Amino acid sequence: MRGFRWPPPPDGGPRTWGPGPGAPRTGRPALPEPETELVDTPHDVQLERLVTGVGEPVTVFAHGFGNGIATTRPFGSAVTGRRVFFQFRGHGRSDVPPGPWSYLDLARDLRAVADLSGASRAFGASLGAGALCRLLVESPDRFEKLVFLLPAVLDRPRGPIAQQRLTDLLDAVAGGDASAVADVVALELPPSVRNTPAGWSHLRQRLDQLLRDGLAAGLADLVEQSPLPDVAALAGVTAPALVIGCVGDDLHPTHIAAELAAALPAATLHVYDRPGFAWTDRADLRERISTFLND
């Protein structure tokens, strides 16, 4: 890791890795990662979990492909009650059971964590939104409130650009090359953020996590899959839902968010006008999610 040379720190210092003289000399230091636990599930897959907050209600948060607890926590920062974050199989310290894997397997992971935690509300981002959709086909009345952030796929496979991005991430992490991983992860950031202290801190955190924990090869099974046989299968879900999409995101097309909102009888759709809104419109996004869930 000390030989890492990409990208340059935002203050123009030497391109070296770590907390030494090459690290950014501006911006806040990254907070230490909280202590997580491994929980047993009825389907014999141990999953990594973090519980924050106190009281009721309880909200479970499901992360995106190649992401995890750390990148999902900010979305729940203003949500009241207990907040339950976890890692799907193949991510973090969670188990890597034999494959092949499907969205039904992810739905079982999500359902197990929700049941063990007593969650009455659910948040799903990207891959997590797909897993939540699959869970709702089996149990349409499981949750009282639902948030879907950047749904990526419903009843048709991802497009070729999105599939290639996910494959590139898996290949880079498997190869263990920090520069290759950084090239892929940097695409998550809007250009205006990439060479700032905040962007550098995010990139460093993501690289630390991905190169430490890796991503299971079984995740490749999911790249070409879709979670639903037909989006019409969600017609029985009557819980209030918030669906959040954006314009211009190759991994999360606007029409997927619109189709999901149309399929859910009690859904509200909000579409941001550009990718990277989790950075550029962070306060608005946090308020939008918390207002919906806290109401």
Regions found by a protein language model. Name each.
Residues T41-D95:
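Conserved HGGG/HGGXW glycine-rich cap/lid loop of the alpha/beta-hydrolase fold
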Residues F85-F123:
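Active-site loop/oxyanion-hole signature of alpha/beta-hydrolase fold enzymes
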Residues G124-L132:
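Gly/Ala-rich beta-loop-alpha elbow adjacent to hydrolase catalytic centers
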Residues C133-V173:
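Flexible "cap/lid" loop of the alpha/beta hydrolase fold
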Residues P157-G159, G175-V223:
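Conserved alpha/beta-hydrolase catalytic His-Asp/Glu region
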Residues V237, V243-G245:
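Short beta-strand/loop motif that positions the catalytic acidic residue
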Residues V247-H252:
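Acidic catalytic loop of the alpha/beta-hydrolase fold
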Residues A266-D295:
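Catalytic active-site module of serine/aspartate enzymes centered on a nucleophile-bearing elbow/loop
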